[in-house]
Each structure stands twice: as structure tokens, then as C-alpha cells.
Amino acid sequence: MITITDAAQSHFAKLLANQEEGTQIRVFVINPGTPTAECGVSYCPPDAVEATDTELKFEQLSAYVDELSVPYLQDAEIDFVTDQLGSQLTLKAPNAKMRKVDDSAPLMERVEYVLQSQINPQLAGHGGRVTLMEITPEGLAILQFGGGCNGCSMVDVTLKEGIEKELLQKFPELKGVRDLTEHQRGEHSYY
């Protein structure tokens, strides 16, 4: 369910050494399954463990997850990254905003999941987003761009070289991707 790298485990172990004996960590999602979902990690003293929690045992510690957060933390990864600027803890939870869909789910749901969990987080860096409007009987995914993508001069490259390539690779049943956005360039546009 959750991967905690050795570097992150070592970091947590150092922090936990200064806490009450038996304290572990809790990984959680606030507003799971919504666009405002946020993940977090906190200390979990022994008296804060609930009977409904899932305990994930790692080499150096245990992580507790409340039952509501469990499905939204599938495939999550916690790492401790060090570079020239310093060190930071990273928590990637691709399913926090939208629960992972089954491979047998309808094509529309599977495409929507990929857009929300993989494409939109990349577009969000530019204040943009994309929404699946429909999948035509001919197998075309009809998308609408919003935010910083609306009116952006790079939207065609993003559509063809990024989104379309990724969707066609993941979903061979799709024949292409089309943009139905009426682009209006303005201050909101990224480029």
C-alpha cells in the first residue's frame, strides 16, 4: 500500500527517538477523493491508535493509517530526498484525490482517473487543468482545458506530445484526443 524508503525510515527513526516510547507515525488524507485532498504524516503515540487503523510494519517503524484513508493511499510513497539545497521529506499519493479505478472499469472512468491522478498534477504547476468531456463512439477523447492552459500558446504541444501520447499508450482502444476549448488568451494564460 505505502512504500517508505530506507532514507525516509531512517529520518523518521531519528525523529521518533525523541518522542514518547512506542510512538510511531500516522499517514492520513484530509478530504480524500476530492480535488482539495491533502496528505500528511504525524506522530502517533500508543494511545492514539484506533482499533480500525491499519498497521503497516516497516524495518525501522510502523505506520498507522485510518480506515477512511486506506484506499486513497494505495501506491503512495514517502521518501527523504537530499540535494544541493538541503533535505526534504516527500509524500506522493497518486490516488489521494481520486480512488484508483479497476482495469475492468468503463473506459471513461479509466481515462478520467489518469487525467486526474497523472496529467492534472503536471498541468497544475502552470495553473492549468484538463477535463474529459466525452469519449465519442469513434474512440476520440474530447477534452477541455482550463486555468493557465486556456489560451496558452503551447496547448497544442501539450495536447499532442503529452496528453495524447500518454493516453494512447495506456488505452489502445482510443483513436485520438481532441480539444473543444474555445481558447481565449489573457493574463491567466501560462505562455
UniProtKB/Swiss-Prot annotation:
Entry cofactors: [4Fe-4S] cluster
SUPFAM superfamilies: Fe-S cluster assembly (FSCA) domain-like (SSF117916), HesB-like domain (SSF89360)
Keywords linked to the UniProt accession: 4Fe-4S, Iron, Iron-sulfur, Metal-binding
Stored InterPro entries: Fe/S_biogenesis_protein_NfuA, FeS_biogenesis, FSCA_dom_sf, HesB-like_dom_sf, NIF_FeS_clus_asmbl_NifU_C
The UniProt record lists the keyword Iron-sulfur: yes
Cofactor: binding comment: Binds 1 [4Fe-4S] cluster per subunit. The cluster is presumably bound at the interface of two monomers.
Residue runs in coiled coils: none
Keyword 4Fe-4S included in the entry's annotation: yes
GO biological process: iron-sulfur cluster assembly; protein maturation
Residues annotated to bind [4Fe-4S] cluster: 149, 152
Alphabetized GO MF terms: 4 iron, 4 sulfur cluster binding; iron ion binding
Pfam families: Fe-S_biosyn, NifU
Role according to the record: Involved in iron-sulfur cluster biogenesis. Binds a 4Fe-4S cluster, can transfer this cluster to apoproteins, and thereby intervenes in the maturation of Fe/S proteins. Could also act as a scaffold/chaperone for damaged Fe/S proteins.
Similarity comment text for this entry: Belongs to the NfuA family.
Subunit architecture: Homodimer.
Name of protein: Fe/S biogenesis protein NfuA
Protein source organism: Yersinia pestis
